[in-house]
């Protein structure tokens, strides 16, 4: 990118390789990576940035495939200045860069039940953007409000009336950067909450490839809701089930594989490219549609351009 960009107080890095910033460890470079010093720095930068330059707010890369040709424009990555957490009664306000797991633990310390976040990979801004959920609870169920910076640098407050929530998605526009989120949870004994989270972690580690290079669930459940984690949760329209029925558990392409442990987890077995991973996912979608007439929808976000050949 040759355009002149504003000079921020934070860090602005050209031609930044993004593969090391994603959990799948794949992807090409961003034209620019911007790490703002604080909210004011972010607002000023966005206000001065040419409106024609694309902007992509990036969390911790836990639910993301960056294509091998990289991302055009500016990738915004929030860091330490956006990691504060404050508690007021049953409400928790946290910076968008706070990890979901950390928020769940600190909320539990305060006797506030946000335990559903404990096993969700990623940070709070991304969790809001995709209405993340687990064990029958979603961000939408706890959402009070958020602070955000629009593409023109305006800082705004978002309420429930400003966001439409659906399964694994919201209508928050592209280019809007969430900076903090307020959630509300039921009051409960801290020890009970921590015990619940330990049980959730044990169940996750026993059923999911947590030690592999993965981006979490690859496809949304066709049923249109997440697993509740309860023993009576036996509905057939789970992504892993239809993938199994299509014979795609363990399927490979290059260094990519649909996990043998949990077939809705796309993993980098070593040396995979973004094209391997996305291509295998598309093979799975095609096979599931051919065998069962079900159109699987990606849960992992895929961004950027393919590598030129």
Curated annotation (Swiss-Prot):
UniProt GO BP: cell division; cell wall organization; peptidoglycan biosynthetic process; regulation of cell shape
Keyword vocabulary terms for this entry: Cell cycle, Cell division, Cell shape, Cell wall biogenesis/degradation, Cytoplasm, FAD, Flavoprotein, NADP, Oxidoreductase, Peptidoglycan synthesis
MF term (GO), any: UDP-N-acetylmuramate dehydrogenase activity
Record's compositionally biased regions (Polar residues): 207-231
NCBIfam families: murB (TIGR00179), PRK13905.1 (NF010480)
Free-text function comment from the UniProt entry: Cell wall formation.
Region (Disordered): 202-231
Official protein name in the record: UDP-N-acetylenolpyruvoylglucosamine reductase
Catalytic residues as annotated in Swiss-Prot or TrEMBL: 168, 217 (proton donor), 299
Cell division among keywords: yes
Any Pfam family the entry gives: FAD_binding_4
Domain FAD-binding PCMH-type as annotated: residue spans: 25-188
Cofactor(s) listed: FAD
Catalytic activity: UDP-N-acetyl-alpha-D-muramate + NADP(+) = UDP-N-acetyl-3-O-(1-carboxyvinyl)-alpha-D-glucosamine + NADPH + H(+)
E.C. number: 1.3.1.98
């Amino acid at each position: 990118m040759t355009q002149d960009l504003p000079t921020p107080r934070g860090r602005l890095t050209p031609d930044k390789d993004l593969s090391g910033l994603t959990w799948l460890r794949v992807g090409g470079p961003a034209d620019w990576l911007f790490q703002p010093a604080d909210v004011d720095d972010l607002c000023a930068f966005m206000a001065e940035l040419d409106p024609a330059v694309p902007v992509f707010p990036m969390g911790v890369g836990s639910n993301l495939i960056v294509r091998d040709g990289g991302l055009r424009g500016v990738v915004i990555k929030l860091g330490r200045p956006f990691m504060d957490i404050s508690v007021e009664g049953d409400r928790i306000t946290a910076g968008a860069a706070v990890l979901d797991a950390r928020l769940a633990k600190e909320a539990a310390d305060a006797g506030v039940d946000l335990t559903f976040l404990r096993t969700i990979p990623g940070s709070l801004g991304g969790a809001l953007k995709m209405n993340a959920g687990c064990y029958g609870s979603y961000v939408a169920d706890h959402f009070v409000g958020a602070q955000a910076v629009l593409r023109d640098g305006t800082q705004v407050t978002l309420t429930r009336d400003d966001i439409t929530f659906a399964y694994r998605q919201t209508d928050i526009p592209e280019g809007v950067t969430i900076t903090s989120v307020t959630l509300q949870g039921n009051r409960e004994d801290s020890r009970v909450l921590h015990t619940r989270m330990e049980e959730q972690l044990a169940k996750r580690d026993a059923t999911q490839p947590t030690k592999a290079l993965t981006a979490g669930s690859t496809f949304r459940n066709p049923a249109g809701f997440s697993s509740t984690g309860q023993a009576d949760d036996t509905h057939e329209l789970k992504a892993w089930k239809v993938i199994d029925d299509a014979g795609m558990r363990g399927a490979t392409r290059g260094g990519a594989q649909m996990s043998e442990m949990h077939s809705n987890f796309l993993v980098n077995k070593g040396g995979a490219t973004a094209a391997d991973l996305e291509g295998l996912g598309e093979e799975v979608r095609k096979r599931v549609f051919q065998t069962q007439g079900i159109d699987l929808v990606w849960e992992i976000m895929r961004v950027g351009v393919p590598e030129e050949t």
